[in-house]
């Protein structure tokens, strides 16, 4: 896969993830997440799997807890025909005004139904973030 195409797929995925969360659309949002997802680096959790993510999103969406999610500075790490790895700066604004900003490393995978889904996410600690991500 060409780098430009991988960049486009990742950007489209991020746009749809932010829009579905902003619209509190649980079905659409979770349709973008692999049943095999694994999230590391979230304080208080060793690992977040699909069921935990679903439960958290359902609670947040039903209670309209997220005002917006935005991404910027996508930095492509690697790409193949079926996987795209990148880092991106994520900003989550809560409906109560709380602000959470972090750099995350994400892996998207083209699953058997030809849909690109998130299979892995890692919240980077500051040293990792500075080494692996250049904010544009």
Annotate the PLM regions:
Residues 1-36, 47, 135-136:
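Short, low-complexity N-terminal intrinsically disordered segments enriched in polar/charged residues
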Residues 26-31, 35-75:
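A solvent-exposed, acidic/Ser-Thr-rich amphipathic alpha-helical stretch
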Residues 33, 90-92, 122-124:
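Short beta-strand segments enriched in hydrophobic/aromatic residues
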Residues 57, 71-76, 89-92, 103-110:
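Hydrophobic/aromatic beta-strand elements that line small-molecule binding cavities or substrate pockets
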Residues 63-65, 92-100:
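Short, cysteine-centered beta-strand-loop-beta hairpins and adjacent loop/turn segments enriched
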Residues 80-90:
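A short hydrophobic beta-strand element
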Residues 101-136:
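Short beta-strand edge/turn micro-motifs at domain boundaries
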